[in-house]
Amino acid sequence: MKVIAVDKVVLAFSGGLDTSVCIKLLEEKYNMEVITACVDVGQPRDEIERPAMVAKELGNYRHYTVDARREFAEDYIFPAIKANAVYEGYPLSTALARPLIAKKIVEVAEKEGASAIAHGCTGKGNDQFRFEAVIRSTTDLDVIAPIRDLNLTRTEEMEYARSCGIPLPSDKLYSIDENLWGRAIEGDILEDPMVEPPEDAFEWTKPIHETPEDPEVIEIGFHGGVPVALNGEELEPVELIGLANEVAGKHGIGRVDIMEDRIIGMKSREIYETPAAFLLLEAHRGLEQLTLTRSELRFADIISSTYAELVYSGLWHDPLREDLDMAVNHMQRRVTGTVRVKLHRGSMRVIGRESPYSLYSEEIVSFEDKTLDQREMAGMVKNYALQAAIYSRVCRKEN
């Protein structure tokens, strides 16, 4: 394998086995000075503090911790809400975070004058595409993926870690990836698609038998398609998403168990918890139904699937995604108002919505109103199914 001749590299670092092994590999196999960086997109506090401690323990490496929570909410999650971006039933929590993490790692590398960026992705997952698509779209820095490039198995990683004195992780049942928008759960027992996920795999969502007996009604305020308030209280983006996670999660809302089609073509059983995403997306769609025209709603469905496919596939910087954002932002300018949602025992439904841009007219809909002259409908109805009528006549002639 050709070794890239570089002096300094910034490693996207979590402090786990993969990236800890990468530190030593980058030094020994690539002869580079390693700088580590962790990007905060809403992980638990211990997952933000651990990388700095591990980097120090492994060799006192220079380490960066970058707080990107607000940027993640405003520039990634909110555009996804406006586009109703969901991939195969999955609200894209991990997929949305990766381009931002890559962006911040690039910024650290440029600040340090590094020649390369490294990550700990394997050759079977989606993240290698998501990281490298952003890096190669925004910089000329080299990209190194030691685990993938050296074709290491998990067992080989652990053997190498032992030889280097790297502490091995405790035997955890699950591998977790968590951010503001969701929690992804993986583990050996979950790889069998016939095995129900054990209850101990979940943290954000309650099992149905532990949810409140009484339903809860919550009001969500939107401005231009973006959630801005809960129960009449305007909140900062990070706080609003966190509170929405708590409210929906305690009612058992937000669990996802799907067979997901990965970028490379393989199917994978994936488990997610995304309570805030379920709640906010449902409310957003409810408000769109009140404020967008029928043709806009139909086109929004097309945008939603295309947008989600681009994000999932790591193509955040594809020009089409930017084009779609422009169209979405124009359509969303009237998606302002309040939506009332009832949560109970793992279910939710929109039970009320209002907007200054409402296209609903109670007067016209009323059976007692004569604003719309019913007699004018006769001509429209007569020719409404014209093609179907012609087709039927043609078929009768054939018979």
Swiss-Prot record:
EC code(s) of this entry: 6.3.4.5
Biological pathway: Amino-acid biosynthesis; L-arginine biosynthesis; L-arginine from L-ornithine and carbamoyl phosphate: step 2/3
Main location: cytoplasm
SUPFAM superfamilies, A to Z: Adenine nucleotide alpha hydrolases-like, Argininosuccinate synthetase, C-terminal domain
GO biological process: argininosuccinate metabolic process; L-arginine biosynthetic process; urea cycle
NCBIfam families, alphabetized: argG, PRK00509.1, PRK13820.1
HAMAP family recorded: Arg_succ_synth_type1
The name this protein goes by in its record: Argininosuccinate synthase
The organism of origin for this protein: Methanothermobacter thermautotrophicus (strain ATCC 29096 / DSM 1053 / JCM 10044 / NBRC 100330 / Delta H)
